[in-house]
Amino acid sequence: MTVHTLHRFDRRTLLTAGAASLLASHLPAPAWAASSGLKVTVVTGSPHRHGSSFLLTDEFIRGAKEVGAEVYRFDAAFKRVTACSGCDHCGLGAADCVYRDDMFELNPHLIDADLIVLSTPLYYFGFSAQLKLVIDRFYAINSQLHSPRKAVLLAAAWNSNDWTFPALAHHYETLVRYMGWEDVGQILGTSCGTRSQTENTEFPRLAYELGKKVCARA
């Protein structure tokens, strides 16, 4: 059970309810969030509109909007996104991708975003295939995306072992580092197998609080 905001902690410590509550309640809002009109782009990877990761996403967005953030949401599982074939026609952003699909709707919002939120169910210890399709297509706008901005990870998993989330978190953190972004929070929801199970955990509240905290206006 985890929220990781701005500070480094031991992963096992992060996977406890106490650490999650401590981080959510005691960390101050970051200074960069003081400006108004923060542009937030949320990309989800769940194929279940009423699933656990969607619940976390909804709560994060609710918190973000309450403090004035401008939120754009892209539900990848319900969009037409073709897998990157590595043809290199785009040349890392020098030309358009050969696939004319719904990524052309998403790309301007990714490029303009102050904060990018990735939301996923945990599928075999990684991103869902639907979200990974989108991430792979970052290649076509790599040069535009490779610039300072903020990032958040929201994830939900059925199981609650201490080794449940490290692989996903490492993948996300590596992506963020490569892109030159700053990780400002992770909600890693364990024991979130069904929506009703998730509703009985602290993770929806933590997602809401994180949305408010990282998107707060002065």
What are these regions (language model features)?
Residues 70-73, 182-189:
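Short beta-strand elements in bilobed, periplasmic/extracellular small-molecule ligand-binding domains
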Residues 192-196:
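A short acidic, helix-capping loop that chelates divalent metal ions and anchors anionic groups
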Residues 43-44, 119, 153-157, 187-188:
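Short beta-strands and strand-loop turn motifs
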Residues 2-21:
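N-terminal secretory signal peptides and thylakoid transit peptides that target proteins
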Residues 75-79, 150, 189:
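A short, structured active-site edge motif that brings together acidic residues
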